[in-house]
């Protein structure tokens, strides 16, 4: 901070900066990638970094009081998902609400059959290209406020869809 404080409180929220991360965001690099092979290489390197992150998380022993979101079936599409009841958004039109409820039901059903077979552990949960910095091939993940326990495919799906 300007005052050399490592933890800053603003409007009841706390912010920290550990160190500056050099490089460009993945979104910037993808927008300026000259060749499809460059994009392929970026995603390849990202996959390696993500696997290393998940493996490190599996080898980490969290402190006894460690609590994070659960991005499991209930946390994603249950009655009280982590990010709220998306189907109850007051801005939705009736047919949009109906569609989201239908998708929620389908996802709930699909995950009920898959959840025991999917790799589950600590995930980033917000791995969008703006939260990935790349500097001379070195990949750094940013913004861990949504980090929690969930399906590892969630991280892969997020980076591919965003």
Feature names for model-found ranges:
Residues 44-47, 104, 124, 157:
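Generic structural concept
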Residues 78-125:
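Loop-centered beta-sheet repeat module
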Residues 1-62:
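ATP-binding pocket architecture of kinase catalytic cores
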Residues 153-162:
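Active-site activation/catalytic loop segments of kinase-like enzymes and analogous catalytic loops
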Residues 1-18, 71-77, 122-125, 129-134, ...:
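Structured catalytic core of nucleotide-sugar glycosyltransferases
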């Amino acid at each position: 901070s300007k005052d050399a404080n490592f933890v800053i409180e603003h409007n009841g929220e706390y912010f920290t900066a550990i160190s500056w991360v050099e490089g460009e965001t993945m979104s910037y690099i993808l927008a300026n990638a000259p060749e499809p092979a460059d994009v392929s290489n970026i995603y390849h390197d990202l996959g390696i970094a993500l696997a290393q992150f998940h493996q490190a998380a599996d080898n980490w022993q969290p402190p006894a009081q460690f609590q994070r979101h659960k991005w499991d079936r209930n946390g994603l599409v249950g009655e009280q998902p982590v990010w709220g009841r998306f189907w109850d958004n007051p801005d939705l039109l009736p047919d949009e609400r109906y569609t989201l409820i239908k998708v929620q039901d389908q996802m709930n059903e699909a995950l009920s059959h898959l959840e025991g077979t999917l790799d589950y552990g600590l995930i980033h949960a917000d791995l969008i290209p703006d939260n990935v910095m790349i500097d001379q091939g070195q990949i750094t993940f940013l913004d861990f406020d949504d980090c929690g326990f969930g399906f590892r495919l969630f991280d892969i799906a997020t980076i591919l869809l965003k």
